Structures are given as structure tokens and as C-alpha cells.
Amino acid sequence: MHRNFRKWIFYVFLCFGVLYVKLGALSSVVALGANIICNKIPGLAPRQRAICQSRPDAIIVIGEGAQMGINECQYQFRFGRWNCSALGEKTVFGQELRVGSREAAFTYAITAAGVAHAVTAACSQGNLSNCGCDREKQGYYNQAEGWKWGGCSADVRYGIDFSRRFVDAREIKKNARRLMNLHNNEAGRKVLEDRMQLECKCHGVSGSCTTKTCWTTLPKFREVGHLLKEKYNAAVQVEVVRASRLRQPTFLRIKQLRSYQKPMETDLVYIEKSPNYCEEDAATGSVGTQGRLCNRTSPGADGCDTMCCGRGYNTHQYTKVWQCNCKFHWCCFVKCNTCSERTEVFTCK
């Protein structure tokens, strides 16, 4: 039985990396040897592996946050030629797209935000050691507005700092792509921080609101995804500035401008133009669009003309059958008719 438990824990870390482990079970995890477990997780950089070994409870929460980012990416781009489908197939950790494109910018931003969100939530729920509610938001009274800090405010700064230490640790090479990735990581975390919400509860006699107790909460991650998708649509192309004597990349500037104007901190930035994602190409992270569902009448990105890249589409017909017009008869049975509908779906050639 002990061997089966060891094997179960091992596959949780290695394959999924997305399940919470209650603090009471951590002794069993530590007993397995954090070094053994962390050395088996694919895609970790050396500094990330060190964090895993020192905080085996946190690596599972980090994995869940990274997976949440991948899921959100797939939702936001579900109607596009590139739909994030190749992300996370082997591991939720490590670099996924080799081209420094808009799509790479989005994946880095949404992953960094996902890790920060998951760590912050786990701290608030008591699922991580060494963190909890935001202590600085306890006991302060705002007399002018008639409210005070109370409850459990989400400590987003801890989550952001943990995301920064872990996610940014994979950027080892001193090149333009490193500057791009670090900027987009920070942009994703900044969007999350800016969307923190204030919730309040009234206190007073007979339902009056004499005073209010307030606390900060995390936004829904879908909201973060929508905002980052807007940032993706307005992403800024940048180029590297080599200001040191060693000619190493120092900072990024907006490419179209003659001045040394830096991008805004919440801008998503890219250094290479996106491929068209029509054909399968492992180097660009494209799985192609062959076999993808498309909308024959849509003029948008999900339309067959755009999705299929001019190759045309196949038409598939099938009959959908379901029970309908159900009525209750006394006593006591329900009688239904059988309805059917002929449906067509279209897939790219």
C-alpha cells in the first residue's frame, strides 16, 4: 500500500502538476524526497528546480496556475487559426513557442498571471505554508469613507512575488527574447494586480450601514484573460537596445519610433511577426488548421475562408435526435415525441 501511495504522489507531480495537496499530507510528500520528485518534472530550469525542492507544496499550486493560464489561452483563441492547442501537451512548465511573436507574448503573460493568481488564492485558503491573508490590510480604519479593513484580504503581492521568482527564473540567456519574455511576464502580473476588487460588508442597527468592513479579492481569471486578449490585439513590436560596452541587450524600445520610447508596463510586446499558422510547424508551435471546425457563413477568424487558408472545406452531415414536447399524464407518466434535425458541420481540408 505504501508503494502504491508513493507511485500515486509521483505521477501527481510528474504528469499533472495541477492538484492541491492538503497541508496534512505534506509529510508524506516530503518523505518521498523532494529532490527525487523535482528532478523528474520536465521543463524546469535550475532555479525553478531549486524552488521546487525547497517548496514541494508550492510546485503543485504553481502547476495549477500554469495550467489555468493554458486553459484560458485556449479559450481566448478558440476561434483562431492558432488556438494554443499545442501548449501544455508535455509539461505545463518551460518555454513553448520559439518565435517571439504576439502569441508567445500572450502565453507568457497569461501563464505568469495564472501562477500569481493560483498562489494568491492558495494562500488565502490556507493551502500554502508561509503565507496567508494580507497583514497590511488589517485594522486600518478609513474615517472619511466610513470603512475599515477586515476579513481576509488576498495577498496578491505575495502571489506576484512568487510568480516573479519562479516564472522569471527560466529566463537564463541574455538576449532579446529574454527581455521580451520578462516584460510580458510582468505585464500579465500587472493586469492581475490592477483588477483586484474591493468587497465590503455593512454593519449597523436594523440593517443600516453605519460602518463597513472591507477586504480585497481576486478577480475572476476569465476577466484577466479578456484584458490580456485586448492587450494582444494592441501588442507593440519592439527592438532591443544594446547600450553596454559588451553589446548585451539592455532594454526594449518601440520599433516604429525613432526615439528611445519604451513600451508601457502593461503592453504586450513582440520582436518577430507571427506566422500564418496554416500548416503544421513544430518550430513555430503551429499545429495547422487541417480538420478544424469552421463556420461557413462567418466573415470572422472562425469563418471557413479564413480558418482554412484558402484550401477549402469538407461538409459533414448528421442527424441529431432528441426527446421533445414532453407532457405529464395523470397518473403518472411522461410521454414525449421524438424530434430530429439534420445538421451540417464544416471542417478544413
Swiss-Prot record:
Tissue specificity here reads:
Moderately expressed in fetal brain, weakly expressed in fetal lung and kidney, and faintly expressed in adult brain, lung and prostate.
Give the record's PTM text.
Palmitoleoylation is required for efficient binding to frizzled receptors. Depalmitoleoylation leads to Wnt signaling pathway inhibition.
One Pfam match, by short name? wnt
| Domain-level remarks | The intrinsically disordered linker region is required for recognition by RECK in brain endothelial cells.
Q: Where is the lipid attached (O-palmitoleoyl serine)?
A: S206
Physiological role: Ligand for members of the frizzled family of seven transmembrane receptors that functions in the canonical Wnt/beta-catenin signaling pathway. Required for normal fusion of the chorion and the allantois during placenta development. Required for central nervous system (CNS) angiogenesis and blood-brain barrier regulation.
**Self-association state and partner proteins as the record states:** Forms a soluble 1:1 complex with AFM; this prevents oligomerization and is required for prolonged biological activity. The complex with AFM may represent the physiological form in body fluids. Interacts with FZD1 and FZD10. Interacts with FZD4 (in vitro). Interacts with PORCN. Interacts with glypican GPC3. Interacts (via intrinsically disordered linker region) with RECK; interaction with RECK confers ligand selectivity for Wnt7 in brain endothelial cells and allows these cells to selectively respond to Wnt7.
- Write one Gene Ontology MF term: frizzled binding
User: A GO CC term?
Assistant: Golgi lumen
Spans annotated as Disordered linker: 238-266
Q: What is this protein's record name?
A: Protein Wnt-7b
Per its UniProt record, what PROSITE patterns does this chain match?
WNT1
Localization of this protein? Secreted, Extracellular space, Extracellular matrix; Secreted
Q: Which family does it belong to?
A: Belongs to the Wnt family.
State the disulfide connectivity. Answer: C73-C84, C123-C131, C133-C152, C200-C214, C202-C209, C278-C309, C294-C304, C308-C348, C324-C339, C326-C336, C331-C332
Name the keywords, alphabetized: Developmental protein, Disulfide bond, Extracellular matrix, Glycoprotein, Lipoprotein, Secreted, Signal, Wnt signaling pathway
Glycosylation sites per record: N83, N127, N295
Q: Give any single GO term for biological process.
A: intracellular oxygen homeostasis
Q: What is its main location?
A: secreted
Hey, what's the signal peptide range on this chain?
Answer: 1-24
